[in-house]
Amino acid sequence: MIIDTTEVQDINSFSRLESFKEVYGVLWVLAPILIIVLGITISVLAIVWLEREISAGMQQRIGPEYAGPFGVLQALADGTKLLFKENLIPSRGDIRLFSIGPSISVISILITYLVIPFSYNFVLSDLNIGVFLWIAISSIAPIGLLMSGYGSNNKYSFLGGLRAAAQSISYEIPLTLCVLSISLLSNSLSTVDIVDAQSKYGFWGWNLWRQPMGFVVFLISSLAECERLPFDLPEAEEELVAGYQTEYSGIKFGLFYVASYLNLLISSLFVTVLYLGGSNISIPYISLFEFFEINKEYGVFGTTIGIFITLAKTYLFLFVSIITRWTLPRLRMDQLLNLGWKFLLPISLGNLLLTTSSQLFSL
């Protein structure tokens, strides 16, 4: 039997080409994930540094300044310190619930980054139910807090977990009703479609102007979901020591710390996507890609500009949340529940009815 060497070389070349395509396909999938993970990490470190600097300025004191230039590496130094601290476990607590609780809180928040359109064609998963996926997955985080509080075998921790669950239920409903109103205006539950629906009229096409009541309710509910002052009842120092975090130390305590800032970042991103036009530039009748005269599919420069615009709007909301934390006092538990059930819920429901009526009359 005679083997044609030319055919063998062709087969080898074809197999190498197929292998190269497979490797390239894997890298093409992993690259956006790695970029977003790196971006999230840097963003969390930046938020911590900004909060410390802003709070120091408001209180007329010197903020972090020793770790790195202007103290930018202080958050990284604190995280490294927590990694090497002893991981204590309560002797009479439920070890499994105590250990799983922080992981559930962090993972449930990280999953929601899948549906955030940072720029055109730069979203990990464009789902038809993107905003509802965020609401559904974010509802799992309080379960982790409740597990942590119960597994700690500590009355302060358990009360903190119960408060977290009650607070989440109270403010999840107004938040969902506001998202429904936005979905009715955009005729879609996809985050990408919601951003596209706001792109036609530039600055005046933002849902902020079409849904002012919904924007205020969404803003307050987002702060409550993030457990930020004045809504940090689950970890009130004067009443519950540290709430559900009382018995935690080391890396597990660090996970809760990271989860709070991850939740704040994802809430800020959704404020940008739902109400501030996402990555769209604020010039009427001119889209981002027409403005820079670049190709939508392959314009790396355009994608970078879109990410920058999204982050600029996001950090504007972050600045508001930081200012709110250091200016307003903490609410009582009854005040917090009354605000959610007696004020925000009726307002968000009325806003949804008005939006539905306007959409019906416009048909």
From Swiss-Prot:
Family in the record: Belongs to the complex I subunit 1 family.
HAMAP family the record matches: NDH1_NuoH (MF_01350)
Compartment list: Plastid, Chloroplast thylakoid membrane
Signal sequence, renumbered to the chain: none
GO biological process: aerobic respiration; photosynthesis, light reaction
Membrane topology: Multi-pass membrane protein
Reaction(s) the record says it catalyses: a plastoquinone + NADH + (n+1) H(+)(in) = a plastoquinol + NAD(+) + n H(+)(out); a plastoquinone + NADPH + (n+1) H(+)(in) = a plastoquinol + NADP(+) + n H(+)(out)
Biological role stated in the UniProt entry: NDH shuttles electrons from NAD(P)H:plastoquinone, via FMN and iron-sulfur (Fe-S) centers, to quinones in the photosynthetic chain and possibly in a chloroplast respiratory chain. The immediate electron acceptor for the enzyme in this species is believed to be plastoquinone. Couples the redox reaction to proton translocation, and thus conserves the redox energy in a proton gradient.
Main location: plastid
Protein name per Swiss-Prot or TrEMBL: NAD(P)H-quinone oxidoreductase subunit 1, chloroplastic
A GO term from the CC aspect: chloroplast thylakoid membrane
Keyword terms of this UniProt record: Chloroplast, Membrane, NAD, NADP, Plastid, Plastoquinone, Quinone, Thylakoid, Translocase, Transmembrane, Transmembrane helix
Catalytic activity, EC: 7.1.1.-
GO molecular function terms noted in the UniProt entry: NADH dehydrogenase activity; oxidoreductase activity, acting on NAD(P)H, quinone or similar compound as acceptor; quinone binding
Superkingdom of origin: Eukaryota
Residues that span the membrane, as ranges: 28-48, 98-118, 129-149, 253-273, 300-320, 336-356
Organism of this sequence: Lotus japonicus (Lotus corniculatus var. japonicus)
Subunit structure: NDH is composed of at least 16 different subunits, 5 of which are encoded in the nucleus.
